[in-house]
Each structure stands twice: as C-alpha cells, then as structure tokens.
Amino acid sequence: MRVARILGTLEPGGAQLSALWLSAELRRHGVATTLLAGDATPAGLALAARYGLPADAYRVSDVLAPGSLQWTPAPDFAGWLGPRLADADLVHAHMVGAWWAAARAVPPHVPLVASEHNQMSWPDGDHTPQAREAARRVDMFFAHGPMVRAWAAGIGLDDGRLRRGRSSVEGLPAGPLPGLPSPRLTFAGRFREDKAPDVLVEALALVAAPPPAYLVGDGPQRGALIRLVRARGLEAVVHLPGWSYEPARYIAGSSVHVVPSREESWSQSAVLGLGLGVPVVGTAVDGLARTLGGGRGVLVPPEDPGALAGALSRVLGGDRPDPAPGRVYARQFTPRAAAAVYAAAYRQLLASRGNSGWASAARP
C-alpha cells in the first residue's frame, strides 16, 4: 500500500513525532510512506530523515510564521501537491492546512484521511468556512482531543467519518541519563505560548527551595524564557538542555513532571511521564484533563502559577498519586498499537473503493 502522508508543518514537535513513529511502524503492515510537508524547518527535515522518511517540502525556513500551513489554506500548496499524489493509494493529511490542500489535489478515486492533533486556535485568522468545504472530500477524520472532535462534528464530519485519534509515545521503559541530580523537576515540549513554559518558570519562583528543573525542548519562546528565568533569579535552578530525541531519559526518575499547557488535546509528554511512573502535574484543559483524570495525575487550573506552585510543593513533599493506574493507561499508546488502528482504517477505505458512489470528488 502506498500512502502519501502530508504534514502542514514539519518541525520537532509532538504531532510530527507521532506521525513519524506511525509511518515507521506501518512498514510492518506493508505500508510504504511518502512524506510531504507544507512548511518545514531544517531541524524538522533532519528529524524525518532520522526515521528513514526523507521529506519533500513546499517551503523551508528556520522559523515558522503564525500563518504557517498548519493553519492556513493555500491554493499554491494544493497545486504543488497535485503531481506528488498521483501514485498514492491513499492520502493521510495532518493539520487543516494540509488536508484542505489535499482535498483540492487528491485524485477522485483516492481515499483522503485527515487528522487534527490540536485545539483549533487559529493564530492567524479563522478558516472554519474553508475547512467545512474541504471536509466534504474527507473520507475519514481522526480527532485527537475533545475540543477538536466537537469542532469537526460542527463542520459536518460526525456522520460516520469521525474517529478518535490514536497517538503514541516512545521511550517506555527508559533509564535516566547519567549525572542528572535527584530530586529534579522536568518539562518536555516546544517553547511556545500554548505549552506555557513561562507559567512553569513563574511557578518555580513561588516554590520554596525549588529543585533543579530541566526544561527539555526548544522553540520561538526560548529567548523570552531565558530572560524570564534571569528576571526571577532562577539561573541556578532552570536548565535548558535543548531539543532531545530521548526526553524519556530526562523524565525517568524525576521527582515530578510538569505539563503546564494553556491548550493540550493530547500530551505525549504527560503520557510518557505516567508510563515511567513519574508523578505528573498538568493543567485541566481539553484532553489533558482526561489523560490525568481518574487519579492518574494532579490537575491544576491553567495560567495559575500559584496553584501550580502549590501542587508542585505538595508532590515534592511526598503527596504523590499511585503510579500504577498511570502505567496501565500509558501502555495502550505504543507505536505498534497506533499502527494497527490506522492500518485497519486504511484497509477499510481501500476495500470500499469499488462500492457504488464511494469517494466522489466531494460530498453534497
């Protein structure tokens, strides 16, 4: 089976990693993946190549703008995609800018699968009307969180085409990197407003004698984060080791792992912490509230450094959730389990190819 996988943006990030792990694991199911990207960074291209998936990108730049092809419909991108989809048996496009373009470019007989990994926050203008039109051509839609699922239902996809997205994590089990201090606190993710590393720094400033804190990742807020760390006098506490291919080795053995997000449909970072038996403190937003619910983690309000500081202090003081439920929960999110779900979905769509009326250019 030849699958063209299209990413609206290709950069080091959770949605991209999940798509790369999925593509690599689908090889076991006889799926050969061609990776295409709208906007890509050099680091994103290197990340894809690391998983044996050299990517063809429409645009490459060091920094992705808010109006990137993650969010923005672009007819020129659709035109670029057209000849690159000619040999695909199935197209799976991730992020609205990608599946909007794919809906224009995919041949009428080829199934189109779409995925959304994030809350629809529209940083550069709301394109819901364009998405509603493109959704007529989508044959199956995977939503990776409660809020994006509700949005997808609102544009007409809740008619048998809507599915719960299945993401995955890597790094279970893992041992800590040698030389890391104990106790320590960890964060792993993009340095962006939605991931709220700034809120974590503000919370650390309120914790009495905070332990060393390792904020693993990179992103556009790095400079602002460094300035905030200095302003709060936390230079000796906060460590910024940069992007890591093995964040689990920082998280393993940590005293507490923190997910302070303002928005979070599904957090690889939180699930990784749970799977490693590390206490996880996160915000009660969207899908993260579900992940850490049921006593698996500790939930606090978003954008509340005081509440976050209080929760961190309690966990560091020994008031920790039972790790067993979190470990059990995390086991279902392996790349192998995700690949089985998507391989079955792809085969279902391809088996329907000969059915009368299937895969028209657009639904009425």
Regions found by a protein language model. Name each.
Residues 136-161:
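A short, active-site helix/loop in glycosyltransferases that binds the activated sugar's phosphate group
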Residues 5-72, 219-220:
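N-terminal strand-loop element at the rim of the active site
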Residues 294-305, 314-319:
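Conserved acidic donor-binding segment of nucleotide-sugar-dependent glycosyltransferases
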Residues 93-99, 116:
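Short His-centered aromatic/hydrophobic patch
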Residues 243, 262:
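Aromatic "clamp/platform" in nucleotide-sugar-dependent glycosyltransferases that forms part
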Residues 113-139:
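A conserved, positively charged/aromatic
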Residues 16-24, 183, 187-206, 220-227, ...:
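A conserved mid-protein helix/loop that constitutes part of the nucleotide-sugar donor-binding site
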Residues 279-282:
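Short hydrophobic beta-strand element within catalytic cores of glycosyltransferases
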